[in-house]
């Protein structure tokens, strides 16, 4: 039988990849001034994300619940994330006098939609099944430690918001894996993408956090694991409101991710991390390099089956060359851990040390 598709891939996928020359990458692009390149690269990134929600006219922050914790207070809040969306979130505020450094926490995907922000901040006054769901997830991927609470105990204001389709921003009828492709298709039909929408929400979340009177807007960072890691380095590229970013278990190249055997070829969840047209100009490490010379951290696992080590190493080399070109090698941290797709406590401690170095006075 004749065919031109095998698995989920066209048989000519290699030729398609060969035509991607990433002409806007630093060093390939015509710009020789790095700041001029950054402006053009970021503008192109924004063009690929058009038809985004307007910024909110006012945040309209309300605190709806509070819980005292050891060294900090957990607050359940609602605020206007954009002109279209009023969202619930968790905000952790350390005891003492601010202004404090602050971190936007970006949750993972995991094809697990019942919780979002609760994957990173311990929920409170919730149904027992939500508490159990969160505890089990944190045990499975975060070494039984809520990363947000860990950072708050160490003096950081922490904000965690659900991405669209997760937690309290979910689907009325209940979310499932297959819903993603239809939701993503509908975004595409309206000239934008689900991924772009998530990124703009993250930008607005950061701007909101930086606006709070007890936050030092010069010391705002972002952190995520898995899809949250992708969101984190994208956020570092998209906005100067982020002063430092850390990304755990999401960095690679199109060469190694677009293969017949890599998880990304399944579609579905991949739509949440897709900005159409962007690959014609920039590969993943090129986009991440828009953040240079800001302090930026990447951790990956040698045993992580989702991200081939050769692709991680290629991406690291690319970014290292960019930071080095700007005399900022000391501001880029790249490390492959002897670990699976997992954010262990030692890694969390290393991320805290990174933020302490760059975001604390």
Language model segments and positions:
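Glycine-rich active-site/cofactor-binding loop and its immediate structural neighborhood
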Residues: 66-126
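Cap/lid segment of the alpha/beta-hydrolase catalytic domain
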Residues: 98, 106-200, 210-211, 256-259
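Alpha/beta-hydrolase fold nucleophile elbow
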Residues: 214-226
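Mobile cap/lid helix-loop segments that gate and shape the active-site cleft of serine hydrolases
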Residues: 182, 186-190, 197, 204, ...
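Short beta-strand/loop motif that positions the catalytic acidic residue
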Residues: 291, 298-300
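C-terminal catalytic histidine-bearing segment of alpha/beta-hydrolase fold enzymes
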Residues: 317-361
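Glycine-rich nucleophile elbow surrounding the catalytic serine of serine-hydrolase chemistry
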Residues: 224-234
